[in-house]
UniProtKB/Swiss-Prot annotation:
HAMAP family: UPF0398. InterPro entries: YspA (IPR010697). It comes from the Bacteria. This is UPF0398 protein BCG9842_B3730. It comes from Bacillus cereus (strain G9842). The lineage of its organism: Bacteria, Bacillati, Bacillota, Bacilli, Bacillales. Transmembrane segments: none annotated. PANTHER family: UPF0398 PROTEIN SPR0331, UPF0398 PROTEIN YPSA. Belongs to the UPF0398 family.
Length: 184
């Protein structure tokens, strides 16, 4: 596996409204564990669409991993131009920082938002251009990742395409591990 697409929930879907929320650290730790394993097995590129939440947290994790594995690259392929234009200023600044550090940035449709079809095109693009999908996703709580996960599963039924998931139970294990370590 050379290229993995990473996605997951938006912050509000998880009840997270600031990047210093303790849940963000747990999600980033889970992403770090999975991505490091994949890098050790030959992963070269992580691709995201740049949406707030899991995808931008994954970008931060890639930057951390690059310290030890500088050949790992991050690409941000936005579904349309200026996706951040209606975001709050602090979210725009955070997003622009991630883009400034990415190894490659492009827009899939090369135009501003016109219709939900652009998200469908984004999902298809990500599944076509990657060897696997990593999603912070639990079928018990479908949310925004549902559509790309369905697209990935369809491809997996006809081709050698893998979907990897970080489930809420894994995040709960990390929380308990942190509590255990802090109690010692």
């Amino acid at each position: 596996m050379k290229v993995i697409a990473v996605t997951g929930y938006k912050p509000f879907e998880l009840g997270i409204f600031k990047n210093d929320h303790p849940g963000v650290g747990c999600i980033k730790k889970a992403l770090h564990r999975k991505l490091t394993t994949f890098v050790e097995d030959g992963l070269e590129w992580v691709i995201i669409s740049g949406q707030l939440g899991v995808e931008l947290w994954a970008a931060e994790v890639v930057f951390e991993i690059q310290v030890e594995y500088p050949d790992l690259k991050l690409a941000v392929f936005t579904p349309f131009l200026e996706q951040e234009e209606n975001w709050k200023e602090d979210n725009r600044e955070y997003y622009e920082f991630i883009l400034s550090q990415a190894d490659h940035v492009d827009s899939i449709t090369k135009r501003k938002y016109e219709s939900p079809e652009q998200f469908k095109l984004k999902n298809q693009f990500f599944i076509e251009k990657s060897d696997a999908l990593l999603a912070v996703y639990d079928e018990e709580k479908p949310g925004s990742p549902k559509y790309i996960v369905e697209t990935a599963k369809k491809k997996g039924e006809i081709e050698n395409y893998h979907s990897y998931f970080i489930l809420f139970s894994e995040l709960q294990d990390i929380i308990e591990e942190e509590q255990w370590n802090n109690a010692e």
